[in-house]
Amino acid sequence: MSRPEPTGENRIVEPEEIFFSTTDAKGVIEKANSVFVDISRYSWDDLIGAPHNIIRHPMMPGAAFLAMWTTIKTGEPFCAYVHNLAADGATYTVLATVVPLGEGYLSVRVT
């Protein structure tokens, strides 16, 4: 699957649109809720089994994700604002909190 190009559209995520995903230890998506599917514009089939960086926006610096992985691998939670890229090229910005969960991670996103 090819990555979309940013279109310049900014999608607003409403406060009640709380969404989550769980991943394995390598960041491969195992579960997600329907809000994540709706906002990301990816289908269930595209998301489940894909690396979580499928939604990575090219304007996000790699250092942000290095800081996240360094933190969560120690068992600590990580929280940051993240610009994501939907399948249709729209940008959406969320406050992401990532915490260790079993052998993987849970990420909850809000605005």
Regions of interest found by a model, annotated:
Residues 2-111:
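Sensory/regulatory domains in signal-transduction proteins
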